[in-house]
Amino acid sequence: MLEKLPRTLYWENGALFLLDERRLPHEAAYLECTLSGQVCDAIAQLAVRGAPAIGDAGAYAVALWCLNERPADESAFEAAFEERCGQIAAVRPTAVNLSWAVSRCAAAVMSALAAGLGVPAAASAALELAHATLEDDIASCKRIGELALPELRALAERLGRPLRVQTHCNAGSLATGFYGTATSVIYHGWEAGLIEKVWVDETRPVGQGARLTAWELMQAGVPCTLVCDNMAGALMQAGQVDMVVVGADRICANGDFANKIGTYPLAVLAQHHGVPFYTAAPQSTFDRSLASGADIVIEQRDPLEVRSALTAGGWELVAPADVEVFNPAFDVTPHQLLAGIFTEDGILRV
């Protein structure tokens, strides 16, 4: 069912190719990256997005720097490498997968150097680690969906029918190496006959639900209906939502998690209406160094996103050009609102 979905990123002939998601759903085009800065720009500008996918891309950014941009003087390598890794990890601060993947690549490089293998071998180690990061991401996402099936089956059996699921933003194949996190749950549930349809929040201000999730589900043949974010309460009040599943960009030790702005009010609505609310994420999204959501740094984005609507031709101004804007990219959902966290190791209760 997923054969029509494009690869979010892949490595070929010494270059990283990133699906430019800014151009979806109108055009599927790839960016060819041979420099770390090109990857960083793609992450910052949302050409590639989603916590696991930007982790994958970040690992390749480290490898590209080692392969193509390292200083000619090998004695200057370590200091320059450490500085560049810090810059790559800081491109989007809320999603922990980016800093996690960069740290893993950095460790592989430093291990090769410590073993006396030299800078070229260390660069090769970075590339191997980037490949492994992508492969692990795909395997983890597939497992998330497989291990969610007992929970979906129990909910469907309780209701006596397949489930109507609501999701927010894009925690899909487009946000990962493949399968997605929340959509892996949806795809596996749909194939098993446990899901009837999906309600897709448009997800203002950048419209990841409207532009990406709706398109992705349609490509996969999963019935879906697009709704504005402020329609969720009416849907639940009418008894049209049986469960909610979203992704996550960072999960704290206590289960609080950051996800796309608008997730928190959706969780509050779900609790009020007795609708079970889940997040889905790989272990790489957990940041157990943070005690709670109060410790999460929230990225603030360009006011243009709120003043405008994103169209096929770019951003079109719809509000006064000088109106003051508050534009956090994420909000934090308290763990008390969660029915569970779907992971590649099974469901976690918090």
Task: For every predicted segment, state its role.
Residues 194-195, 201-350:
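Conserved phosphate- and dinucleotide-binding cores of soluble alpha/beta proteins
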Residues 31-47, 163-167, 310-322:
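Short, hydrophobic/aliphatic alpha-helical segments
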Residues 7-116:
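Long amphipathic alpha-helical segments
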Residues 32, 36-39, 51, 55, ...:
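Generic structural signal for well-ordered, non-membrane alpha-helical segments
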Residues 99-163, 194-196, 200-244:
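Ligand-binding beta-strand-loop-alpha-helix segment within the catalytic cores
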Residues 45-61, 92, 97-98, 170-179, ...:
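Conserved phosphate/anionic-ligand binding catalytic regions in large, soluble enzymes, centered on
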Residues 180-191, 267:
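Histidine-anchored nucleotide/phosphate-binding helix
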Residues 19, 57, 101, 166-170, ...:
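Short beta-strand segments
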